[in-house]
């Protein structure tokens, strides 16, 4: 294989490693959780959004599921979420890594099928985001219909809006800058 496109695979893995080691993912998860505290299953929605965003930095399922399993699952169970529900949210969110560009699977498929990776990325972005949106809608409806699956956080745990806004900006800017630099 003398295709230069495959050199992107270890670079995406390295980028995911750097994002994780910098603590961007954990900050992003907790910032989104705070920002969405009024929604049913806000922590599950935050986990899904974080999975979708982190998958753009890694491009692989295993890294997303492992990291979010270590980060979000204990927090969700501690908050009183159903263990099966929390596990399903993390596993389904991790699977978004195949569809949301830049996906290593799309890169490998582009090489094998002799297609343009950029065209595959363009073709996969809408289905990936649509699937993420459908997961989020499902989780919210499921938690609304059965509140014991995902209890709302106590109101005393919610900081002032200025603190939430600052945390969201500080956690989103580095990751979005990286995504824009990579995808162009």
Regions found by a protein language model. Give the residues of each.
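Alpha-helical transmembrane segments of multi-pass membrane transport proteins
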Residues: 1-184
